[in-house]
């Protein structure tokens, strides 16, 4: 039986720390099936700045922020040739079947999804959780530019602003296994990408 893919959200902030390329190299060498969710990073930040300047509505900002994730994906494609775009569950399956690693482009699946709020209460973290839910409850890893204690609860990371407000509800509804990985966790992340990793621990 084929191993179930994991969902890995690669935070856009990693591009500002020098950690992005090494992480993408680890993912490109993965011996497990992986679906990458790109963070919006500075592209999404610019949407927020522009909205503050000219006051367009949250629904438009939500779509533009998702397109910021698409822009970040384009950056990822230039850095690792084993990454390929996918904008649907079927597309993800097709890319995985070729032996490549799908990078999810969220707009098509998310713009009319009634489970996704069209505002700033959800970011790429919550969207990654929603994708994991729609994939049947895939294990979810969020790669961040800060370290988080392994024992930190979902309530604590939400209160601290480490994840978006919508993340908690999606994870709880879907019963997802999840973990946040910071700079100190890269060796552990590499081990998770081996063919038979240790049992998931959130």
Protein language model features and the residues they cover:
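Nucleotide/pyrophosphate-binding catalytic subdomain
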Residues: 1-199
